[in-house]
Regions:
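Amphipathic alpha-helical substructures
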Residues: 1-104, 110-112
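Helix-start/N-cap signature of alpha-helical segments
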Residues: 265-273, 301-309, 322, 362-370, ...
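Residue-level signature of alpha-solenoid helical repeat scaffolds
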Residues: 278, 311, 375, 417-420
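Residue-level signature of the C-terminal ends
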Residues: 282-283, 315-320, 379-384, 421-432
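Short sequence/structural elements of tandem HEAT/ARM alpha-solenoid repeats
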Residues: 287-295, 322-332, 386-394, 432-445
């Protein structure tokens, strides 16, 4: 079926990946790495029926090599349809010194099949998913401890033992002088200070924000004393669910923002960083905006993580936050890609003009981050769902003053992305009859520049 083939091509490699992870967990350390040579050998010796690999013969070979019982896996991921959704919570029990985890699962495919049986005649939705899920808890001593949850019911509580009786040492994000003092003490031979510094992962540090004046210029938010007290009393750093990628599922897990910040700054796994960025994007605050801005600035992050952080800043451009997310987006773009233009007011003001530097696309990671910043700025809306005038003016300036004369790469796709972003600002989220003279003026100018650039590039 040509309509079904794209879905099969998408699901098949994912199921094979899950099978490889399961085989590794069941004792076959090489997973499919031991199965594939057997299949090649069967093809060479002519043992393979009609020289074609079938599902049953493949699974039989997997069972013969690993000795694992794959019937449950086959029923759920090959013969069955759908994917689970897990809703998880974690609570620390100080009396028993353990973490109580509640896992509730849902099967959207089964729910849909019950509500629309006529549309699910050919499907075989799985109503209850079973298997093991790895939970990685980063405790106070900085050591990640892995625990395995055996999922068998729709709702189940797990008592996860806690290993560390250690009062944690956290980074004090608003007092960089403390880090400098600790470093000086460590250099002088203070073993306790050296140990404290060793527990801090400085791989994603940002030296620019060590200067107090720079922090003020960037409006960097710091944790309050209440936040720091809560953080100091927290028993663990953060928790990751399905750390070994054994499930093709949607996992919803809630933890405080400071734990997501720790995960983003201290976990070197790109998937963990992405999960932290997405979670923080749904928790807009001054701290979130500063953290995501720092993520964009630190070039050691994978460029797509930096791009996702830029998109998350658009969610922090809220009136009650004084549009801090938009301010940080403008600061990021002006600092890296704009000329220093004299301005009567504050050079960091949202009203300050943005005149771009000549294009330089030699750094491809930086190029994609640049495009992400442009689209993130274009996503900012006011409480009526309309794009801000300063956003449209910013995009118009990018088109008007674009200079590609010294760039060794063409800027066609770059200009197209700006035009696309500018066109998006003309579409309100809620188009219920709201307009002002300023909106109409800049919208008309935006439309004219869009048509002009489209004519020039066409």
């Amino acid at each position: 079926d040509p309509q079904l083939l794209p879905f099969v091509n998408l699901k098949a490699p994912l199921v094979l990946y899950l099978l490889d992870r399961r085989l590794c967990k069941m004792g076959a350390s090489l997973g499919l790495g031991r199965v594939i040579p057997k299949l090649f050998l069967q093809a060479i010796t002519g043992e393979m029926t009609q020289n074609a690999l079938g599902t049953h013969s493949f699974l039989r070979t997997c069972k013969k090599v690993s000795g694992a019982d794959l019937r449950l896996f086959v029923d759920q991921w090959i013969n069955g349809s759908g994917c689970p959704r897990f809703l998880c919570t974690a609570t620390f029990n100080r009396k028993k010194l353990l973490i109580e985890m509640h896992v509730r699962q849902e099967s959207p495919a089964a729910i849909y099949a019950q509500a629309h049986p006529e549309d699910a005649l050919a499907s075989n939705p799985v109503s209850l998913w079973e298997g093991q899920m790895t939970v990685r808890i980063h405790e106070a001593d900085g050591t990640p401890y892995e625990h395995v949850l055996d999922i068998k019911n729709e709702h189940q509580r797990y008592d996860v033992p806690f290993n560390t009786k250690y009062k944690r040492v956290r980074r004090n994000t608003k007092r960089f002088q403390a880090r400098q003092a600790a470093a000086a003490a460590a250099a002088a031979g203070d073993e306790d200070a050296a140990e404290a510094i060793g527990m801090i992962d400085l791989g994603f540090g940002l030296g620019m924000w060590e200067d107090e004046d720079e922090r003020k210029r960037w409006r960097v938010a710091d944790w309050t004393e209440e936040d720091e007290a809560i953080m100091a009393s927290a028993p663990y750093e953060w928790i990751r669910l399905d750390a070994d990628f054994e499930w093709m599922a949607q996992i919803q897990f809630e933890q405080p923002d400071y734990m997501w910040v720790s995960q983003l700054q201290r976990d070197r796994d790109v998937v963990a960083q992405l999960a932290a960025v997405h979670a923080l994007s749904q928790m807009p605050s001054l701290i979130t905006s500063s953290t995501l801005t720092r993520t964009v600035l630190v070039t050691k992050y994978f460029y797509r993580i930096r791009a996702e952080a830029a998109y998350g800043l658009a969610n922090c451009a809220l009136p009650h936050l004084d549009l801090l997310g938009l301010f940080h987006l403008f600061m990021l773009f002006r600092t890296s890609y704009c000329l220093d233009v004299p301005h009567e007011g504050d050079s960091t003001s949202l009203e300050a003009p943005c005149i771009p530097k000549p294009n330089d696309f030699s750094d491809m990671a930086d190029y994609f981050v640049r495009r992400a910043l442009i689209h993130a700025i274009a996503r900012v809306r006011d409480h009526r769902g309309r794009a801000l005038v300063i956003v449209q003016r910013f995009l118009i300036y990018l088109l008007r003053y674009n200079d590609n004369s010294t760039n060794r790469f063409v800027d066609d796709y770059y200009l197209a992305s700006i035009i696309n972003a500018l066109a998006g600002t003309l579409i309100p989220i809620d188009s219920a009859g709201y307009s002002t003279h300023a909106d109409e003026t800049y919208s008309a100018e935006a439309v004219s520049y869009t048509h002009l650039r489209a004519h020039e590039t066409g």
